[in-house]
């Protein structure tokens, strides 16, 4: 079958032919319809330090997708041929303390689809049936293909009560923008998003944020004053991994504020712990999606009217995959989808 693979330990990604994946007793086989390019895939393309330490070569990459079930293992229940599915990209062990307690998103033995095992940039993907999620009929393929990153956004945004609260989102990448849209949809008062990329700040405005602030030109405290915010943000969602953004978040949080952190800093990050202590801040680390509560929330949010379509800015046929990676690497895109069918 055709697949996009990391064939060499250098910059790039290549179309190749690989064997059809084997189907286990508890697995399903999915014929991929659409797959989206994740920031992780760009890291792998660039062959940065993280990728060099993490990705075995060769590796079929990709983990954001939607497709149709074409085969089921003999022990599988609840799925049948023809079902339209996406899937959780973190395959968990089922045996550690967190897995046995139902907190599978905290499994210490997680294996990543398209990172540690064959991924979704291929004609067919095999995953454990446990990891598959049926897509409701009224959710289109393009939105289903971005459920994985949407899940990061939902998990982060819904970590704390948002109703009537003022929220700061640092980082206007696609996940940050989707998180901001979730905050607005569920009843936050002011949702302010910060970045230095004007293209993505414009995209955030299309998604309905209260203010999109280019912090290289605008003062966040002045924006807060213009909005009538005299005490600071109640909730912070750190999506950038940029130390200056996190420092600004700490500066502008209200006493008793709550921060959810999804962005990954490039290395050790020093912060002013006095702010955390004397403001009584709560900081929560976020990884992946809660299995599978986040997935049900994702579907329900879209079915209740949350419109994510503006975040999908580019779609390409799979043979034009290089164009997709080029636009992702440029920073002038939202989500980029590759069409396999």
From Swiss-Prot:
It catalyses: L-threonine + NAD(+) = (2S)-2-amino-3-oxobutanoate + NADH + H(+). The keyword Transport does not apply. GO terms for biological process: L-threonine catabolic process to glycine. Binds 2 Zn(2+) ions per subunit. InterPro entries: ADH-like_C, ADH-like_N, ADH_Zn_CS, GroES-like_sf, L-Threonine_3-DHase, NAD(P)-bd_dom_sf, PKS_ER, Zn_alcohol_dh. The active site is at residues 40, 43. Pfam families: ADH_N (PF08240), ADH_zinc_N (PF00107). Its main location: cytoplasm. It is found in: Cytoplasm. NAD(+) binds at residues 175, 195, 200, 262-264, 286-287. Keywords: Cytoplasm, Metal-binding, NAD, Oxidoreductase, Zinc. Homotetramer. This is L-threonine 3-dehydrogenase.
């Amino acid at each position: 079958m055709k697949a996009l693979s990391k064939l060499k330990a250098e910059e790039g990604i290549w179309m190749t032919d690989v064997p059809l994946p084997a189907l286990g007793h508890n697995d399903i086989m999915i014929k991929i319809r659409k797959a989206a390019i994740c920031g992780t895939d760009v890291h792998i393309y660039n062959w940065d330090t993280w990728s060099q330490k993490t990705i075995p070569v060769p590796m079929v990459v990709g983990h954001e997708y939607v497709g149709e079930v074409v085969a089921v293992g003999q022990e599988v229940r609840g799925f049948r041929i023809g079902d339209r599915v996406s899937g959780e990209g973190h395959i968990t062990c089922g045996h550690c303390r967190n897995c046995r307690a139902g907190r599978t998103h905290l499994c210490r033995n997680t294996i990543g689809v398209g990172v540690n095992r064959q991924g979704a940039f291929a004609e067919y993907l095999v995953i454990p049936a446990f990891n598959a999620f049926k897509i409701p009929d009224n959710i289109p393929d393009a939105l289903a293909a971005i459920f994985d990153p949407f899940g990061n956004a939902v998990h982060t945004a819904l970590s704390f009560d948002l109703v009537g609260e003022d929220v700061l989102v640092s980082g206007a990448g696609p996940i940050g923008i989707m998180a901001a849209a979730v905050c607005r949809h569920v009843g936050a008062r002011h949702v302010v998003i910060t970045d230095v990329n004007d293209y993505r700040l414009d995209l955030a405005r299309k998604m309905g944020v209260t203010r999109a602030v280019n912090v290289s030109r605008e003062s966040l405290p002045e924006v807060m004053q213009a909005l009538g915010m005299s005490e600071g943000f109640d909730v912070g969602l750190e999506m950038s991994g940029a130390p200056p953004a996190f420092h600004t978040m700490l500066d502008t949080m209200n006493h008793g504020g709550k921060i959810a952190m999804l962005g990954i800093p490039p290395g050790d990050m020093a912060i002013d712990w006095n702010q955390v202590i004397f403001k009584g801040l709560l900081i929560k680390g976020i990884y992946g999606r809660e299995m599978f509560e986040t997935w049900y929330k994702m579907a329900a949010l879209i079915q209740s009217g949350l419109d994510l379509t503006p975040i999908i800015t580019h779609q390409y046929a799979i043979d034009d995959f290089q164009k997709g990676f080029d636009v992702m690497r440029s920073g002038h895109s939202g989500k980029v989808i590759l069409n396999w069918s």
